[in-house]
């Protein structure tokens, strides 16, 4: 196996401390990350930097590497290498030396299986109005960069322009193939999963594909009937209130709910009778006339009965 100049790869000196090397690694990992860099050899450079960091970040491996690098031009290097404790290693042991330094990379690099990258999940808030049709959305997330030990070394910001399809529901998962972390040894990238979160609406409650809205009406509107303006997700409509309507009564408006691939839900207007403020003398007299005219009516007649 070729002994690479890891210091040159990292752009540092053999005398530099770990902090300096770590700073260089983070800068180069960000520069050559395959999902960020536009350079044609970015993936190869990224892996090379990661390999160098794996060795130089470990004090023991770095010391052994430095000793091997010092003797790289020695004619005896290919036949015999002297470890720090004076022990001699023959050519057949050379592979083992590399393995001890590089954590089996030297011996098994070509035998390691392709590993798929990690998936990433992010929550995407969506307003009810946005679910009615397909819309574009710019999303930003952090792409973790893993070191050779499987630990997150840093995070690289990434931005994508995506399409959110019509009819998405709360908790729905949308897969963006290959937008997760890069694979290893030729393995495929992980995926990015968008988790849809329907934001609460100040007027509408969601019940499956249907919507509910509380519609305040005056007592005389409930008694006499009439038309009131009611908002929907698209526009306002005139809702007919039947005469004799009761508080809590649900009036169905067909096709004004949420859309989906299978069908469109309905809107249900739930009537709420709202009393006017404290009445004046004239209003009180009218209420008294109504009470006298309906003296036989007992609203609690069936109260408590099954």
Swiss-Prot record:
Cited Pfam families: DnaJ, DnaJ_C
Keywords recorded for this protein, A-Z: Chaperone, Cytoplasm, DNA-binding
Gene name linked to the record: cbpA
Cross-referenced Gene3D superfamilies: DnaJ domain, Single helix bin, Urease metallochaperone UreE, N-terminal domain
PROSITE patterns reported for this sequence: DNAJ_1 (PS00636), DNAJ_2 (PS50076)
Gene Ontology CC annotations of this record: cytoplasm; nucleoid
Job of this protein: DNA-binding protein that preferentially recognizes a curved DNA sequence. It is probably a functional analog of DnaJ; displays overlapping activities with DnaJ, but functions under different conditions, probably acting as a molecular chaperone in an adaptive response to environmental stresses other than heat shock. Lacks autonomous chaperone activity; binds native substrates and targets them for recognition by DnaK. Its activity is inhibited by the binding of CbpM.
One of the protein's GO biological processes: chaperone cofactor-dependent protein refolding
Subcellular location, record wording: Cytoplasm, Nucleoid
Entry protein name: Curved DNA-binding protein
UniProt cross-references to PANTHER family, sorted A to Z: DNAJ HOMOLOG 1, MITOCHONDRIAL-RELATED
CDD domains registered for this protein in UniProt: DnaJ, DnaJ_C
Entry's Gene Ontology molecular function annotations: bent DNA binding; unfolded protein binding
Domain J: 5-69
Positions in coiled-coil regions: none
Predominant place of localization: cytoplasm
Source organism of the structure: Escherichia fergusonii (strain ATCC 35469 / DSM 13698 / CCUG 18766 / IAM 14443 / JCM 21226 / LMG 7866 / NBRC 102419 / NCTC 12128 / CDC 0568-73)
Superkingdom field: Bacteria
